[in-house]
Amino acid sequence: MCGRYSLFAPPEAVEQRFDATFDEPFQPRYNAAPRQSLPVVGDDRDGEIRTMEWGLVPPWADSREDGGFINARAETVADKPSFRDAFRQDGPGGRCLVLADGFYEWVESEGGKQPYRVTLADDRPFAMAVLWTPFEPA
């Protein structure tokens, strides 16, 4: 998954696209980053868009600073202890969709790295699959 993304589409467009409503006031994000509370649609299909902190904290962590993983490889997600339970849905946690209307990819240039925002051709909001676990200090 990318390390930065955006969601600043009109809230009505987001709600219509995902057939869900925000459970708290929508805050546009131009540069969403790990550890921020960001909008998601859960796998419970309750019709609510809620916020969750971006970054998976593994079950053995003593604090939020001990984790915050934002990338998992498809080849190993079912086996790595950090992601296994959420992926298999064995216990607390599971899957959800993080809502976005763009994400940033960085390209090396002479002056350093340059971010480029990637969107759908029609600029509609889209979703990215994520795994989540509740944080409970070990």
Which stretches of residues belong to each language-model region?
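Short linear sequence motif anchored by a di-proline
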Residues: 1-138
